[in-house]
Amino acid sequence: ERNIPSIPSTLEPAITDSSIIYCTDCHRDDEGSSRGPHGSEFVPILRERYETAANTPENYQNYALCYRCHSRDSILRDDSFRKNSTGKGGHSGHLAIGAPCSACHDPHGVNDTGQSGSHTHLINFDTRIVLPATGNRYPVFTDSGIFSGSCSLICHGKVHNNESYPQGGLSLQNRPMRMNRMSR
C-alpha cells in the first residue's frame, strides 16, 4: 500500500478509490423488459448502455454505465489524463475521435503481468481497436507518475512510439506494462 497524494479524480463524490464495486453495480436484469428476469436490453446483462465499438460518438447515453460512477465533466475537462504538449490526447481528445472508454480501460480489471503496478488506471487495451506498435508483442503503456506516462501502440490509424503525456507531480513508478486482453 502506498500513500498517493490527492489528485483530481474522475470518480463521482460518493465513490472513492477504496470503494468496493459489486457485480450488481453494473449488471442486472430488466424485470419489466421483454427479456424478463434473466436478461437486459443492454448486453451482457448491463444496467445501462456501455458502447465498446470504435467510432462511437461521446454522449451521456452511449456511456451511461461509465457515468454512473465516473464524472463526465471531470473526464471531458481532462482532469486526470491531460493532453500532451502538442494539444493531443487526454480523455476528451480520445473521445472526440470516437475512441470508446473500453479501448484503453477494462472495467473488470487487468490480469497481473508480473510487473509492479500492472493494474494502474485499469489500463488494458482492447486489441480489437488498439494494436501493438512495431516490435512489440502487445500495446504498451508506461506509467511514469501522476499525470504522466507514455504509450507505444497503434490507435486510430496512427503509430505512437513512446508517445508521452505531460509530466507533473510525484513519480510513483516507471515500469512498462504489456497488456493483452484475454477476454471481456
Indicate residue ranges for each PLM-predicted region.
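A motif-centric signal for short, conserved binding hotspots located
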Residues: 1-184
